[in-house]
Amino acid sequence: MDPVQSHGSQSSLPPPFHARDFQLHLQQQQQHQQQHQQQQQQQFFLHHHQQPQRNLDQDHEQQGGSILNRSIKMDREETSDNMDNIANTNSGSEGKEMSLHGGEGGSGGGGSGEQMTRRPRGRPAGSKNKPKAPIIITRDSANALRTHVMEIGDGCDIVDCMATFARRRQRGVCVMSGTGSVTNVTIRQPGSPPGSVVSLHGRFEILSLSGSFLPPPAPPAATGLSVYLAGGQGQVVGGSVVGPLLCSGPVVVMAASFSNAAYERLPLEEDEMQTPVQGGGGGGGGGGGMGSPPMMGQQQAMAAMAAAQGLPPNLLGSVQLPPPQQNDQQYWSTGRPPY
């Protein structure tokens, strides 16, 4: 029996030795030592270079004191509050959108979920500018015409009713038309000699009715009424109404009223604005001498107005025209407009 085999069976022998294994072991040890030295150098460098910086930071913190800490704390609190508000807003809007589209989300899957959470763009419906309150005019313009439909009862005088209406309302009345019947009419026909009037007895149908009525203190000569009538046998008569115009049944008059009018004298004179200045500069004795020419002009104007309106001579005493030196503000609420 071989002694080597018998001995090997009793105890194991060490592995064979190779030179390459020894070299690898030395290299690993050297690398490990180099790494350990590098780590020590880095720790030493960091320890000696960061320690002064830490000391400086501590000094700055101590110098800043509670002011820096408070500002940092306030910034953090504001940031956290803003984040909370944004999160609450997003969660609220997403919840509303999910509640609106909840029925569609079950079958839509992931792609439909993104569409449900997408907020619509543009201006929401119903957010247009609110309509403004309408402008209501509570007062009529002074130059506006107001239309009137006047019904005059049986047996009433049309001329007297229109004059009373203008006086009580303090508005000028322009008669445009009239329908109905009248009786016992006194008129002056055109082309007849001055002072001649015609009295018509019976019932007549109104074909045309026109005229104007101004409230006092306007001159009475500015008021007048013209009428055209149809008789029972087909004859047509007309002219300026001189006396009363009595209704035979209800009469409907269409008229327009106005509150602003200017009284003018034609033809206009160049020295019209200089006459009041010259009259005001004279003394009391000269006033009588200046009054005679206006009186002559007044008589001429009265005669011309009587011829135009068809008034008989016995009615001229009731007509009083204003003297020419007085302006139109005495007879109407507003003055004559400037030229």
UniProtKB/Swiss-Prot annotation:
Name of the protein: AT-hook motif nuclear-localized protein 26
This protein's encoding gene: AHL26
Record key words, sorted: DNA-binding, Nucleus, Transcription, Transcription regulation
Bias type Low complexity, positions: 24-45, 292-310
Domain of life, per lineage: Eukaryota
Keyword set includes RNA-binding: no
DNA-binding region: 118-130
Function: Transcription factor that specifically binds AT-rich DNA sequences related to the nuclear matrix attachment regions (MARs).
Biased composition (Polar residues): 1-12, 82-93
Domain remark in the UniProt entry: The PPC domain mediates interactions between AHL proteins.
PROSITE patterns xref list: PPC
UniProt GO cellular component terms: nucleus
Region Disordered, annotated ranges: 1-132, 273-339
Gly residues biased stretches: 102-113, 278-291
Gene3D superfamilies: Hypothetical protein, similar to alpha- acetolactate decarboxylase, domain 2
Pfam family of the protein (one): PCC
A molecular-function term among this protein's GO annotations: minor groove of adenine-thymine-rich DNA binding
Keyword set includes NAD: no
Subcellular location: Nucleus
